[in-house]
Amino acid sequence: MIKRSRANRTERATFRNIRNEHKFIDVVHHGDGHYYMIQYIKHELPERTVVNYMGTRCGHKQKFRIGKATLMGILEDYKKVEEV
């Protein structure tokens, strides 16, 4: 995890899929023992950027609450994206 909040408890990082360059995961850790993951597809077009969240219900993005072991298994297919 890279970016920490002012309270120094929340960590946030973004990862890109190795095989699909348009697939991303945002991982947030609040220090409560669980990780929260939002998965999305991002397409950069000349006129706009399109973001489609996966696992949505009624068009709202959904956070998945997972443990560290599960997260490490998922992140084997992902590479960390450096934030600007």
Give the ranges of each region predicted by the language model.
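Mixed-charge, Lys/Arg-rich low-complexity intrinsically disordered regions
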Residues: 2-21
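Mixed-charge, Lys/Arg-enriched low-complexity segments
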Residues: 3-8, 62-84
